[in-house]
Amino acid sequence: MDKTPGKVHTVSIESSACNETFDVQYYLPKSYSDLYKYNVIITFDSQDFFKYGQIERLIEKLEKTEEIQRTIIVGVPYPSVEWRKHYFNPNGEHHENFVTFVGRELNSFIDNNFSTLKMANSRLLMGESLAGSFSLSTV
């Protein structure tokens, strides 16, 4: 697994809950070191957060000015608009399995591969539109 800090990486994660593979993006800050523990932001619709929102640049700026503590970003991109309906919508056919993937499998992957704080208040879920509703509904 590539832990080069300061760039967005992609890794494939097998989900037994969803019976499929997810390409997950992650960003380690330029100052990343396994010697420190990090908060985690999990973004849904992550390709939009990285490409248009440049979330990694914002996090770097906020860390530098000490407005936030050390943070890594992990994101789940959506392959299509139709996919979002099935996974993010509470009535979607894959919604419950996706909640299980995020809660158990994705969080386990994050904690097993990165130096993270393992407390509920050290995690943030975020998304836009339907992904934002999903984030709020899984808290």
Question: Where in the sequence are the language-model features?
Answer:
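Non-catalytic cap/lid and distal C-terminal segments of serine-dependent acyl enzymes
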Residues: 1-139
